[in-house]
Amino acid sequence: MNSTLIDSLLARRRAVSPWAGLYFLQSLLINLALGYPFSLLYTAAFTCLLLLLWRYLPRGQKALLGICSLVAACYFPFGQAYGAPNFNTLLALHSTNMEESSEILTIFPWYSYLTGLFIFALGIIALRRRKEEEQHRMAQLSGIKDSWTVTAVKPRYHIYVVVIGESARRDAMGAFGGHWDNTPFASHVNGDFFMDYIAASGSTQKSLGLTLNRVVDNKPQYQDNFVTLANRAGFQTWWFSNQGQIGEYDTAIASIAKRADEAHFLKNGDFEADKNTRDDALLSMTAQVLATERTQPQLIVLHLMGSHPQACDRTQGKYATFVQSKETSCYLYTMTQTDDLLRQLYTQLRHSGDSFSLVYFSDHGLAFKERGKAVQYLAHDDKFQQNFQVPFMVLSSDSKAHRIIKARRSANDFLSFFSQWTGISAKEIKNRYRFISEQKAGPVYITNFKLQKVDYNHLGSDIFSLK
């Protein structure tokens, strides 16, 4: 994040937020709706609570505000007539029948119901805060000009494809040493397979932020990413995504996608929206691109949902081999689904008639929870090596053999790989070693959830059980 963005964010924080005023008004109305007398202290205290929760636990704040707004909206007419809830009002509510209830509802003035609707409407507005703020954040991230200085452009292939997987552990894939034959395509296709590639961090936003962007003082410069580098080099760029485009965990990465010449998302909201969208729906988009002959070098990016928890949502509950729990079994089957997508994409590229090279890697791995139990599942973590052990493979139109590369590689060096792979040289990228080789690259550090650099070798182990 560069100084311009930091300054703008600080300016926003210094400014008086209209949301603080809305929270104050809603807190006041909730207090009055429940029949309590006006209290500046209680109103201010609840406003501060909402602001604190928004900063540290936004989903909890939304739940609290939603429940309080709904209860206040419903109780407002009663509160004005009978006062604050107490034992007698609760007893009366419990003992009343339908006829008595309908009679009570008719005695309240119409404006009491109108006020209740107003309270409910304010609650809805408050619950929509994230989307509006994320749209503003997206505009900020997407609007900053890149600072790449391209010094040479010598692409070896006409089409370059980057497939970004999601939550795939390397040891869950047969092609990378996993115990299950669940990746028939990757296990046999010619290409370069990296058996010791380490992700930058343990969650999508943190990991891809450090992988896809130039990093200065441990801070991703979102304007200087691999897409803007390709744009500067004269490539035509495409981004097709099955991830979210607006949301707490999506906006920063989606802002990279927005830098492409063409960007299309299967989901309208965050990553949890439209859960039934499938990764293979992206193939119709790549087919359209490949159907037209183009003179410019092409960069096509596919961002998958892959193996994101819950895995059974990805597979519609389907799995091939039962391992410990249904969720674990579904997780293994997501690897087969991704493998088949890569097979279909590879076939499309072959049929295009153009030279091509495809790289696939996952953003991060997962760790086991409730290990050994019938409810065992996998989730995000940052304490184990397996959280960072992910697949990385390069398949090219001129690959002659299925080659295994054992040298350790770090996602922190992805831009160096991208530069060497595409033939795009830039003053800001220093190539310390040849990425596709057995050349040693030095120690690898990951970034944990506290944004601390940790030596990968010092992490614990979370092996995949065979049961």
List each language-model region with its residue ranges.
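Histidine-centered active-site microenvironments of extracellular/periplasmic hydrolases
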Residues: G177-D181, D354-S355, F361-S397
